[in-house]
Amino acid sequence: TVSSFQDILMRMSKMQLGYSSEDLNGMITRFESLKLYRDSLGEAVIRMGDLHSLQTRNGKWREQLSHKFEEIRWLIEEVRHRLKITENSFEQITFMQALQLLLEVEQEMRTFSFQLI
């Protein structure tokens, strides 16, 4: 998924969209943020039993996890909306792949968080 993230982010950054580039840049920033968060959850799971370390680093990790799930749901809805309104096939493919990747990341985050609980 790392190469998928990089590929989609690169393609999204090159799109000339009819809507605000600030919106697109915000989406790209959120994508990157979610990727980093998913990676940190994965690292905690790899060090299995690292819940104590996660809690020590971030006492409000459950609240942060909840916020990240809200953020990913918002991104999924935003990408779905963009997919519906765009007529450009390149953009449609990019947003479709972004949607698939977001759904995969959401599932990975759920799996990691259940393993930590």
Curated annotation (Swiss-Prot):
Keyword field:
Host nucleus, Host-virus interaction, Transport, Virion
Q: Which GO terms describe its cellular component?
A: host cell nucleus; virion component
Could you provide one GO biological process annotation from this protein's UniProt record?
exit of virus from host cell nucleus through nuclear pore
Compartment annotation = Virion; Host nucleus
| Motif Nuclear export signal, chain ranges | 8-17, 81-90
Please list every transmembrane segment annotated in the UniProt record, as residue ranges: none
What do we know about how this protein assembles, alone or with others?
Binds M1 protein. May interact with human nucleoporin RAB/HRB and exportin XPO1/CRM1.
Q: What else is known?
A: Average number present in a viral particle is estimated to be 130-200 molecules.
Report the sequence similarity comment from the record: Belongs to the influenza viruses NEP family.
In Swiss-Prot or TrEMBL terms, this protein is called: Nuclear export protein
Taxonomic lineage from the root: Viruses, Riboviria, Orthornavirae, Negarnaviricota, Polyploviricotina
